[in-house]
């Protein structure tokens, strides 16, 4: 056990002894997400570095405090990537972090479970987690899964960490499956109203086309094709529309992924004056939702961002009626909880899981479920 891990173990043992709670953080770039952070800060940025990387095996293992940008740069050198496009939120949302923030970390990426524009075609964070080392509430270091897909021992436990918001323990190390960067990528822009855009993107999604990502906002549908050059060219001819220049397209998708584009910048400003940014997960073919406020659609219509002042109950009811759920992504008032209320049986399972890993409730209380 090195000094960085020993320091974290000591803090967990101290918190357990004095019955305090801990706020696990790396870059603190997702402090706005989920319930409000409370407790003594537990900084994991000392747990940094790529432990092992086997490009030929498409597997990388990194410590939890490793900057996400550092990991992705190492993968890019070998022509590989995290295909689910984890967002890089760069603004420190907690004043205690200050200018020394490293941006998002690998552990935070897994704990938040957020994925970018390609999620609908390649899967999410949990689909790429092969194994993990977790420090539980008893200050015990547990290992789950492995570094190859065929090693299934503990595999599901590792995947459970994705989206857990840190309530199960400190993610000390993660093994991830990576993939080669697609040989060809092309972005198209097509004018379409929301209903037509939903229909068309789902029609194309049901065909053997290399459709990697989509986004609709303000009457414009943007599509990304990725794969073999011949397949990308053939799909572009079939779909039509305006081809977006490569640099401009890359900036668009990065801005969408990192919430730096016009829609999300405007939403962040609106939140400061009392609006809320909601993320609704619904079946992709769901018709346009009749809700006030600006909307941006991703994932073929399966993910719908809405910036509105409408009551939380109205958003949750609309999502539920469509067969989905709503998450309060950004907003000042999270008294009712950021995430959709779970069915009693699922809430019970979650609490029992938390009790098994963190019996004293040390880690990130209230970030996932209201206390």
Where are these regions (language model features)?
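N-terminal accessory segments
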Residues: 1-29, 319-341
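Residue-level signal for inorganic ion chemistry
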Residues: 26, 223, 306
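Helix N-cap motif at beta-to-alpha junctions
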Residues: 193-196, 225-232, 283-286, 308-313
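FAD-binding subdomain of flavoenzyme oxidoreductases
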Residues: 94-214, 220-221
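N-terminal glycine-rich flavin-associated loop
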Residues: 1-22, 44-98, 110, 114-147, ...
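Short beta-strand
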Residues: 23-24, 212-217, 295-299, 328
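Terminal amphipathic helices with adjacent charged low-complexity linkers/tails
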Residues: 224, 228-249
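Conserved glycine-rich FAD pyrophosphate-binding loop
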Residues: 35-37, 92-96, 244-371
